[in-house]
């Protein structure tokens, strides 16, 4: 049973072989329609990949020779049988003897001739091999290398490609280079030392020191290990030391997940580490129908679990990015099959008309509107795939951050990057159509948004006259904008623009999967310098023409095309053979075209996988660890509503546990539940929380001075320490906005974010205290934590409400029922009569003329003295009970005016 369960688990954890199935379909279709290649089928009629190896050719020839020899034998036996039966009575014994002797002589001669031929062929092959080894090299090894290269070229999956590449490294001696640590391309000593330190701390289970090493040493390009030149010396992979470092990093995170460190503390440190490393974005360029090349790239990264969370697209890249970003992981295989089976019609006006009639329609449209195609078919296709989803809805559905670039049609606006932050209610299909509106090809298109309440569609800017064109014109790869918004510092670019990628083929950054010598690398570098010089000169000429007023709009757009950056840290490019298919640039894609581009995209991504794994391995591992910790915090916390996380400093945090009395007697618990009202519109959705983390200053709140005291208890009880002040209520709820002047309902939250504005205790009324307390006005460091205090039992009947009509009296008339918790220096200085118990009185009103008195109680003075945070109570907020529970009046009375009497509420906290 256990073996079956393990097998089932292993099959469930296997990656979805999306690209492999599509590549197999491509070869099946190509081989089935080709006249020169015959598909090979096994006995079960299953397709077998054709191979151009010599071994396959020899096997086929050998099988053919056997079949020919068998046929000859069958024919000879048949003829002899017929002759024997026909002449059986006519042959005598002498003739039979002569015939047998002749047959024996013929067989002996044929045997001798066959042996001589075999000896001659073996001798010739030996001589050829000897001469080749003397003057050229190892003949047999070169033949084997050719066979393995053919296997690598015709691989149908990434695993087959990797195995063929590793075998090539063994045959060519590149494995020795990978095993050798020393290289001038990176700091091997630093990486080796850090790897050994992490392994030592992990094996010794010194988790605090291991976490410190991770926090202070993990960066993306440690010791220049991200140098792309490290990946042009082998067919697959790079130095084994780098692979060992990445493996040890994953093992370190796995050990921390199983450690006894506090989840909130561990979560904060890992979030800071991820912010220090940065974030990766996948950027897809335009390129007409050749943009379907991106499907193979996304499919490969998806099945290898290397797909970044931030995805951006322009023009054709926006189509692919939007369709794949709005679907769940389980929907991707079905989606790809639907794309293959669909018959697209984007560039043809009317299918029922002939080509000449459609051409006349295009010519008339071009002279009338200045565009060659109409975008109505594109709009219908995008609505079919995307529906009326907005950027916010797509993010809430899949968690992917979709970005689409559009360029303004005029000179008076700036290029825009549309996502769920800048355009949350914009319809994605309208953004895609605007990003595909290449001047002269498609007309400019407006952006539409959906009203979140009514669902009504309307122009985004309020006017349909504001239109946008192809995003590739001004910002094909929005690298700087992504860096500003999402802390992106690493770009994986896929470039298929027909006027760009041939020049990028000469760039040094486009390496991986192929062996390049120093001469080729230097030649590429020189050619790249020449290209940059010519581009700068052309940009200068265009600037001069634009300033002179010669076709200012056109020259400005052309200058933007030449001046922008088209490559990233890792750039995936198609093969140069795409240039010979330029006539398919603006044609409706067929099934064969789709399969070919998907196959080319997948095979172009395979050489970059090892670079992506080493560049982004720690980042993706941290993302998984952070998600795992957040999920564990949700499961282990006794929470009744997820909306409380919307206002916490980090997205998810544990709530304090109830006391033993409260757990035994839930009826006596002071837990208050909040009921939403009509006036309370501040109800956030967890999925609409911050995309990444809070501000960088807020993350410092999770750094504690003594991390060793926050480990897990052996008994199973895990103490949870809030990053804010302690509260009597064991639940963290949101507070209403301070700008609301109406009476506040019974609130449930005593916890304020340390980064939130100053609480009401700092704005104490001067009419009561005379002057503000200097101690309470001091702000503590952003990195100091406030430890929770043990809550005492509270009897709601022992306290009374303050009526609205009461006037404020002197401190000498204070009732003995009201007490103070800890003796603050200011209160001791004002009047010692105030201090008699463990309660704190303060005002909770923004208006000094009509303050509202509230009471803080149930704080343990011993715990407060021990915590050494006596002056930091300013973050607590206690909301009162409803006025209907008031029974007696208090000697502290206030007289609000009649105009504001209904706005003030005085109560005590349960």
Curated annotation (Swiss-Prot):
The modification Phosphothreonine is found at residue 675. It catalyses: a triacylglycerol + H2O = a diacylglycerol + a fatty acid + H(+); 1,2,3-tri-(9Z-octadecenoyl)-glycerol + H2O = di-(9Z)-octadecenoylglycerol + (9Z)-octadecenoate + H(+); 1,2-dihexadecanoyl-sn-glycero-3-phosphocholine + H2O = 1-hexadecanoyl-sn-glycero-3-phosphocholine + hexadecanoate + H(+); cholesteryl (9Z-octadecenoate) + H2O = cholesterol + (9Z)-octadecenoate + H(+). GO terms for biological process: cell budding; phospholipid metabolic process; sporulation resulting in formation of a cellular spore; triglyceride catabolic process; triglyceride mobilization. Gene3D superfamilies: Cytosolic phospholipase A2 catalytic domain (3.40.1090.10). Residues 51-120, 657-683, 713-777, 874-910 are annotated as: Disordered. One of its GO terms (cellular component) is lipid droplet. Residues 90-116 have a biased composition (Acidic residues). Keywords: Hydrolase, Lipid degradation, Lipid droplet, Lipid metabolism, Phosphoprotein, Sporulation. The active site is at residues 315, 470. GO terms for molecular function: calcium-independent phospholipase A2 activity; lysophosphatidic acid acyltransferase activity; sterol ester esterase activity; triacylglycerol lipase activity. A motif (GXSXG) lies at residues 313-317. InterPro entries: Acyl_Trfase/lysoPLipase, NTE, PNPLA_dom, Triacylglycerol_lipase_N. The modification Phosphoserine is found at residues 55, 737, 749, 751, 836, 890. Optimum pH is 7-9 for the lysophosphatidic acid acyltransferase (LPAAT) reaction. Disruption phenotype: A double deletion of TGL3 and TGL4, the 2 major TGA lipases, leads to fat yeast, rendering growing cells unable to degrade triglycerides. Lipid particle-localized triacylglycerol (TAG) lipase. The lipid droplet/particle is a lipid storage compartment which serves as a depot of energy and building blocks for membrane lipid biosynthesis. Involved in the mobilization of the non-polar storage lipids triacylglycerols (TAGs) from lipid particles by hydrolysis of TAGs, releasing and supplying specific fatty acids to the appropriate metabolic pathways. Also has steryl ester (SE) hydrolase and phospholipase A(2) (PLA(2)) activities, and catalyzes the acylation of lysophosphatidic acid (LPA). This is Triacylglycerol lipase 4. It comes from Saccharomyces cerevisiae (strain ATCC 204508 / S288c) (Baker's yeast).
């Amino acid at each position: 049973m256990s073996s079956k369960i393990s097998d089932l688990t292993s099959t469930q954890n296997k990656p979805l072989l999306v690209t492999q199935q599509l590549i197999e379909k491509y070869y099946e279709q190509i081989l089935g329609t080709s006249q020169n290649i015959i598909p090979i089928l096994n006995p079960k009629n299953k397709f077998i990949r054709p191979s151009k190896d010599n071994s396959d050719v020899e096997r086929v020839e050998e099988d053919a020779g056997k079949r020919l020899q068998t046929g000859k034998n069958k024919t000879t036996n048949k003829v002899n049988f017929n002759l024997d039966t026909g002449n059986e009575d006519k042959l005598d014994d002498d003739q039979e003897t002569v015939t047998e002797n002749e047959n024996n002589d013929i067989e002996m001669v044929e045997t001798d001739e066959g042996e001589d031929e075999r000896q001659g062929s073996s001798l010739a092959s030996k001589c050829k091999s000897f001469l080749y080894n003397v003057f050229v090299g190892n003949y047999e090894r070169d033949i084997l290398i050719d066979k393995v290269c053919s296997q690598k070229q015709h691989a149908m999956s990434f695993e087959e490609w990797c195995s063929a590449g590793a075998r090539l490294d063994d045959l060519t001696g590149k494995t020795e280079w990978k095993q050798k640590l020393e290289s001038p391309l990176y700091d091997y000593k630093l990486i080796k030392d850090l790897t050994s330190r992490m392994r030592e701390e992990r094996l010794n289970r010194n988790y605090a020191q291991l976490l410190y090493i991770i926090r202070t040493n993990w960066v993306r390009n440690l010791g220049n290990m991200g140098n792309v030149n490290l990946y042009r010396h082998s067919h697959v992979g790079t130095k084994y030391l780098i692979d060992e470092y990445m493996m040890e990093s994953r093992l370190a995170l796995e050990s921390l997940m199983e450690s006894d460190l506090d989840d909130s503390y561990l979560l904060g440190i890992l979030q800071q580490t991820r912010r220090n490393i940065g974030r990766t974005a996948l950027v897809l360029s335009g390129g007409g129908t050749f943009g379907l090349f991106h499907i193979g790239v996304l499919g490969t990264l998806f099945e290898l679990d290397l797909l970044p969370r931030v995805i951006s697209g322009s023009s054709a890249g926006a189509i692919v990015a939007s369709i794949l970003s709005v679907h769940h992981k389980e929907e991707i295989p079905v989606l790809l099959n639907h794309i293959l089976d669909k018959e697209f019609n984007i560039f043809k006006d009317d299918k029922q008309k002939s080509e000449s009639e459609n051409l006349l329609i295009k010519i008339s449209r071009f002279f009338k509107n200045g565009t060659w195609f109409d975008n109505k078919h594109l709009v219908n296709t995008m609505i079919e795939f995307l529906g009326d989803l907005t950027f916010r809805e797509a993010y809430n559905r899949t968690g992917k951050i979709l970005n689409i670039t559009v360029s303004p049609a005029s000179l008076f606006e700036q290029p825009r990057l549309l996502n769920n932050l800048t355009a949350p209610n914009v319809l994605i299909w309208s953004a895609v159509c605007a990003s595909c509106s290449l001047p002269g090809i498609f007309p400019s298109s407006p952006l539409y948004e959906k009203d979140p309440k009514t669902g009504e569609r309307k122009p985004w800017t309020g006017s349909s006259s504001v239109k946008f064109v192809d995003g590739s014109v001004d910002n094909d790869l929005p690298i700087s904008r992504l860096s500003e918004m999402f802390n992106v510092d690493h770009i994986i670019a896929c470039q298929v623009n027909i006027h760009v990628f041939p020049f990028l083929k000469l760039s040094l950054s486009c390496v991986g999967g192929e062996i390049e010598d120093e001469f080729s690398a230097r030649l590429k570098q020189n050619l790249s310098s020449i290209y940059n010089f010519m581009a700068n000169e052309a940009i200068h000429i265009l600037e001069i023409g634009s300033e002179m007023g010669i076709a200012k709009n056109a020259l400005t757009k052309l200058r933007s095309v030449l001046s922008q950056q088209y490559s990233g840290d890792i750039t995936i490019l198609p093969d140069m053979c795409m240039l010979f298919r330029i006539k398919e640039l603006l044609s409706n894609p067929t099934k064969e075209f789709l399969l070919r581009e998907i196959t080319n995209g997948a095979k172009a991504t395979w050489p970059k996988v090892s670079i992506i794994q080493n560049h982004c391995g720690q980042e993706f591992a941290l993302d998984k660890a952070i998600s795992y910790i957040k999920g564990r915090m949700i499961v282990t916390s006794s929470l009744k509503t997820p909306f409380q996380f919307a206002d916490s400093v980090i997205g998810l945090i544990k709530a304090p546990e109830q006391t033993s009395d409260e757990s035994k007697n839930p009826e006596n618990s002071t837990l208050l539940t909040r009921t939403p009202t009509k006036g309370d519109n501040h109800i956030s959705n967890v999925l609409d929380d911050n995309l990444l983390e809070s501000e960088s200053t807020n993350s410092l709140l999770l750094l504690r001075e003594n991390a060793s005291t926050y480990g897990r208890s052996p008994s199973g009880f895990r103490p949870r320490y809030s990053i804010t002040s302690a509260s009597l209520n064991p639940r963290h709820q949101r507070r209403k906005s301070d700008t609301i002047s109406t009476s506040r309902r019974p609130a449930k939250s005593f916890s304020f974010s340390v980064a939130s504005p100053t609480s009401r205790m700092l704005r104490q009324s001067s009419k009561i205290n005379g002057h503000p307390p200097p101690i309470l006005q001091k702000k503590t460091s952003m990195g100091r934590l406030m430890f929770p205090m043990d809550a005492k039992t509270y009897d709601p009947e022992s306290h009374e409400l303050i009526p609205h009509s009461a006037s404020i009296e002197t401190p000498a008339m204070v009732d003995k029922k009201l007490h103070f918790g800890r003796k603050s220096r200011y209160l001791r200085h004002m009047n010692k009569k105030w201090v008699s118990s463990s309660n704190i009185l303060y005002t909770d009103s923004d208006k000094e003329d009509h303050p509202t008195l509230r009471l803080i109680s149930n704080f343990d003075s011993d715990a407060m003295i021990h915590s050494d945070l006596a002056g930091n109570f300013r973050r607590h907020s206690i909301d009162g009970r409803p006025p209907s529970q008031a029974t007696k009046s208090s000697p502290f009375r206030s007289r609000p005016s009649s105009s504001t009497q209904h706005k003030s509420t005085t109560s005590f906290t349960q």
